[in-house]
Amino acid sequence: MRFTENFERAKKEALISLEIALRRGEVDEDIIPLLKKINEKPNYFTTSSCSGRISIMEMPDFGDKVNAKWLGKWHREVSLDEVLEAIRKHREGQLWLLVRSPILHVGARTLEDGIKLLNLGVSCGFKYSNIKSISDRKLIVEIRSTERLDALLGENGEILVSDDYMRKLVEIANAQVRRFKRKLKRFEERIEEL
């Protein structure tokens, strides 16, 4: 398959892009050791990643990411005060609390390599992992988990939820972060199996 022939060039390009992103501070710090371990493997390279996050987002309509604004974004557990501070910035459109699990896009040299990575991800709890794409240029495996939360908090400047409800949402969001960070650690510890 042609992606196997193009692997070295695709890996070189991806590593250059990663180095630029690292210098700019655009890579989630807690995932950098895992990215380095994957990229040290001769048959793999990372193309994009997120270590998972809790965010407060204001958007005209749900799903309108183009016109959305981050009012708060954290790749770690958060305090109720941090979330309330972000919520107070809400002025227009819909206000959402969002939790997103980690996501890694990894190029693999061969289909067999891709399947090995996919199986490792699933065995570490990343149940939504899949082969994202196969083209002449590259084969991409997506490592993704199940944790997700979407909660409408306000609309057009009005907060629709109580502080007690917010407290509960923050507890749930932090529990999800703890869960997916454990999965990431397990995946990092087992990456040597590839």
Swiss-Prot record:
Q: What class of enzyme is it?
A: transferase
One GO process term, biological-process aspect = tRNA methylation
| Molecular function in Gene Ontology | tRNA methyltransferase activity
Q: What is this protein called?
A: tRNA(Phe) 7-((3-amino-3-carboxypropyl)-4-demethylwyosine(37)-N(4))-methyltransferase 1
Q: Which NCBIfam families match?
A: PRK04235.1-5 (NF003266), PRK04235.1-6 (NF003267), tRNAMtaseTaw3 (NF047731)
At the top level, the lineage of the source is: Archaea
Q: Does the keyword Methyltransferase apply?
A: yes
* Keyword Transcription regulation assigned: no
> Which Pfam families is this protein grouped with?
TYW3 (PF02676)
Q: Catalyzes what?
A: 4-demethyl-7-[(3S)-3-amino-3-carboxypropyl]wyosine(37) in tRNA(Phe) + S-adenosyl-L-methionine = 7-[(3S)-3-amino-3-carboxypropyl]wyosine(37) in tRNA(Phe) + S-adenosyl-L-homocysteine + H(+)
Gene name, Swiss-Prot/TrEMBL: taw3-1
Q: Which family does it belong to?
A: Belongs to the TYW3 family.
Task: Report the source organism.
Answer: Pyrococcus abyssi (strain GE5 / Orsay)
Q: Which Gene3D superfamilies match?
A: tRNA wybutosine-synthesizing-like
SUPFAM superfamilies recorded: SSo0622-like
Q: What is the protein's known function?
A: S-adenosyl-L-methionine-dependent methyltransferase that acts as a component of the wyosine derivatives biosynthesis pathway.
Q: List the EC numbers from the record.
A: 2.1.1.282
Sorted keywords for this record are:
Methyltransferase, S-adenosyl-L-methionine, Transferase, tRNA processing
